[in-house]
């Protein structure tokens, strides 16, 4: 297991958050390309709907990170009643530190962007599981199964 990289990013309300703010809790940290796009909205709403179940199983918090602005995150969170922190990383430093920034292909075009990755971080700040290139529709249910397995240990 490797140590989760620390960060200092603003949430959708302009509050500065770091890894220490979530210390002692399991963290479901997911990286997504862009607010208010079909796949990202589906993923965020699935996490919203699963959050209570995620918290009951392990007490985990959900944190979403993209390079969108604080204002964009605020509108996105309000529009979809998102009940977790969305952190803004416009310079993609944290996104890069977690390995979620890199080359992508879309409609025959190559560019650099955010990979739809999720990291499960232990209360001790260790990355215990990586989900790379997740399917936004099926990801939350898989995560709940994995958290339930961890809770049994």
Give each language-model segment a name.
Residues 1-153:
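Chalcogenol-based redox active-site neighborhoods
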């Amino acid at each position: 297991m490797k140590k989760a990289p620390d960060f200092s990013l603003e949430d959708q309300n302009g509050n500065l958050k770091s890894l220490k703010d979530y210390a002692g809790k399991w963290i479901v940290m997911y990286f997504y390309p862009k607010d208010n796009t079909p796949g990202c909205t589906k993923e965020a709403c699935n996490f919203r709907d699963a959050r209570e179940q995620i918290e009951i199983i392990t007490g985990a918090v959900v944190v979403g990170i993209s390079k969108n602005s604080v204002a964009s995150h605020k509108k996105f969170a309000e529009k979809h009643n998102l009940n977790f922190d969305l952190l803004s990383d416009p310079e993609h430093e944290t996104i890069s530190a977690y390995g979620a920034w890199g080359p992508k292909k879309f409609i025959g075009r190559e560019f650099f962007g955010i990979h739809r990755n999720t990291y499960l971080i232990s209360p001790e700040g260790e990355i215990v599981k990586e989900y790379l290139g997740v399917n936004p529709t099926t990801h939350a249910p898989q995560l709940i199964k994995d958290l339930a397995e961890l809770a049994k240990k």
